[in-house]
From Swiss-Prot:
The chain crosses the membrane at residues 33-53, 77-98, 113-133, 178-198, 226-246, 288-308, 320-340, 347-367. Heme b b562 binds at residues 83, 182. A ubiquinone binds at residue 201. The gene is MT-CYB. Binds 2 heme b groups non-covalently. Heme 1 (or BL or b562) is low-potential and absorbs at about 562 nm, and heme 2 (or BH or b566) is high-potential and absorbs at about 566 nm. This is Cytochrome b. One of its GO terms (biological process) is mitochondrial electron transport, ubiquinol to cytochrome c. It is a multi-pass membrane protein. Belongs to the cytochrome b family. Its cofactor is heme b. SUPFAM superfamilies: a domain/subunit of cytochrome bc1 complex (Ubiquinol-cytochrome c reductase), Transmembrane di-heme cytochromes. Keywords: Electron transport, Heme, Iron, Membrane, Metal-binding, Mitochondrion, Mitochondrion inner membrane, Respiratory chain, Transmembrane, Transmembrane helix, Transport, Ubiquinone. The cytochrome bc1 complex contains 11 subunits: 3 respiratory subunits (MT-CYB, CYC1 and UQCRFS1), 2 core proteins (UQCRC1 and UQCRC2) and 6 low-molecular weight proteins (UQCRH/QCR6, UQCRB/QCR7, UQCRQ/QCR8, UQCR10/QCR9, UQCR11/QCR10 and a cleavage product of UQCRFS1). This cytochrome bc1 complex then forms a dimer.
Amino acid sequence: MTNIRKTHPLIKIINHSFIDLPAPSNISSWWNFGSLLGLCLMIQIITGLFLAMHYTSDTTTAFSSVTHICRDVNYGWLIRYMHANGASMFFICLFLHVGRGMYYGSYTFMETWNIGIILLFATMATAFMGYVLPWGQMSFWGATVITNLLSAIPYIGTTLVEWIWGGFSVDKATLTRFFAFHFILPFIIAALVIVHLLFLHETGSNNPTGLNSDADKIPFHPYYTIKDLLGVLMLILFLMTLVLFFPDLLGDPDNYTPANPLNTPPHIKPEWYFLFAYAILRSIPNKLGGVLALILSILILAFLPFLHTSKQRSLMFRPITQVLYWMLAANLLILTWIGGQPVEHPFIIIGQLASISYFSIILILMPISGIIEDKLLKWSL
């Protein structure tokens, strides 16, 4: 009798995706982040569901409902901080996952890559709306500042902002709809993840060399299930260390003050994982220009397949582009630091230089270095 996992209509889908899936034999730990992102999404949906049972999306009670969760609900503090810090872990894994894709040329799987970009945008939208829900000072002012950016759109901007707000300012209508969207989006993300995997399994995984690995495939289980399990344990260790010892390390103290429309905090800034994009936004003096640069800072990922000039897929054997890649990584850290600093000298000029180099490295220097490397190898025509 044939094994049920190979014949049952539902189980065989899981079998082809996680058990008998042919995987390259040489994929490194950089390939662990896909499964870790799946784990993060599950943690966020489960903790979020339990938080939603006790949360009220009303401006008068939102802040106190979060306080109630932390003080009165059994292990409410644990659920709340797992959810808040789980978002940080989610973005750490996301950035490393995207960085891996850039380094090893995984963006040549166009469908998988484009769904990934949509997933990144959806996750950023979800995280932004989630940050508004506790209705602290930074929640309120963050929502006001970021939604206000849409007013830079010519002609329809102001109308659009008021439509999103549900009034003439961020108020009860805004909070209620943000809660509704924050609840539904993770399930949309989960559906997109399935599509992401569907497209990936059409082509099979990439590997560090960037070469075709059809001649040397191994089954996903037990080799990569056990490898993923190590990553899972490390992620949980890191997350729980953060939650139990440093729960407020990545948060903003201003968010422990209830939202007050009459009192603006001295430095309005988003969560740490948006700071690089926030720095790019602030580095351009023009409002519309800043918004376009902000969107382009993420959307530039969609142009990577067209900017690939090298005859090699991966950066594994491309030392010049490797140097540029790590310069880009360092540049992103500088942008993250600048995004959290006040708008004054010398931070303004550092942010502007870092923004210019961010786009220059991706759009100009990396494509040129790809051509140079091909010439050095006498591969070019």
